[in-house]
């Protein structure tokens, strides 16, 4: 089974027009594991998919790891939760991260509850599981 490391973003906390926020993907066979989710993570995964890395098709993004809770490493988290769901991810996102990851996740889901309700019950019905997140906090 072949393993690849794909750099999805190598930016810093500074707004740089030529670099997306910190994010990588470890691709093992046909599975992708996202590591950190800086701004642009889903767009960059989509670009990698269109350049031949099938495992980075956005609706297949189902497992992610967060190294730490700095904003430059997490600002793309709502995008990682919701965009693949809108694109019909059928299962919850599994996220492994430090203490505080569950708290952050709960607040993101709360902030977007109106959108979630609209997408589940509105005109273009989305599935009821793809926006959910299963968090495992890892003690450091």
Predicted features, each with a name:
Residues 1-140:
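Binuclear metal-dependent hydrolase catalytic cores
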């Amino acid at each position: 089974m072949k393993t690849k490391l794909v750099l999805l973003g190598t930016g810093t906390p500074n707004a740089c027009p030529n670099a997306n926020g910190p994010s990588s993907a470890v691709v093992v066979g046909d599975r992708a594991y996202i590591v950190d989710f800086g701004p642009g993570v889903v767009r960059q995964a989509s670009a990698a998919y269109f350049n031949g890395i099938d495992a980075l098709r956005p609706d297949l993004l189902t497992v992610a790891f967060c190294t730490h809770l700095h904003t430059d490493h997490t600002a793309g988290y709502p995008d990682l939760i919701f965009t693949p769901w809108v694109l019909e991810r059928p299962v919850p996102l599994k996220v492994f991260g430090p203490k505080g990851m569950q708290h952050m996740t709960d607040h993101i889901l709360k902030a977007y509850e109106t959108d979630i309700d609209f997408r589940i019950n509105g005109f273009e019905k989305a599935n009821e599981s793809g926006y959910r997140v299963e968090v495992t906090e890892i003690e450091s």
